[in-house]
């Protein structure tokens, strides 16, 4: 199985960190490829940053299906472009934020999301 992990910001160092961490847990028969867009915000810290990140992220999602990947993981807790990506391709697209919230809801009645970014506090 080939899974592309898209870091929606342009931080190569963060993408390299993802690559190293995922390589240490990747199972047999699973190829994990980590990429990030070549343009867009370096960090996604606001709704504006998220809006800028979506178009190049969707380009990568479209390319992933074209290149034969079996699934896409969006590696940003705000899941930028998740719904649009699912409309765009026929392969599964999973966001780490949505996945974490679903798991938290299954494990307990109450949970919270912590952030150090003031722009993300409702």
Model region roles, listed by residue range:
Residues 1-58, 116-122:
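N-terminal glycine-rich anion-binding loop in soluble enzyme alpha/beta folds
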Residues 54-109, 113:
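Glycine/small-residue-rich loop that forms an oxyanion/phosphate-binding "nest" at active or ligand-binding sites
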């Amino acid at each position: 199985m080939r899974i592309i992990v898209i870091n929606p910001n342009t931080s190569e160092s963060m993408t390299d960190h993802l690559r190293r961490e995922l390589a240490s847990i990747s199972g047999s028969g699973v190829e994990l490829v980590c990429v990030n867009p070549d343009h867009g915000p370096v960090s996604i810290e606001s709704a504006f940053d998220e809006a800028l990140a979506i178009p190049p992220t969707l380009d990568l999602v479209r390319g992933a299906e074209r290149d034969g990947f079996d699934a896409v993981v969006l590696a940003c807790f705000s899941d930028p472009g998740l719904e649009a990506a699912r409309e765009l391709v026929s392969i599964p697209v999973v966001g780490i934020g949505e996945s974490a919230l679903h798991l938290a809801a299954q494990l307990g009645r109450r949970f919270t999301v912590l952030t150090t970014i003031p722009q993300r506090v409702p």
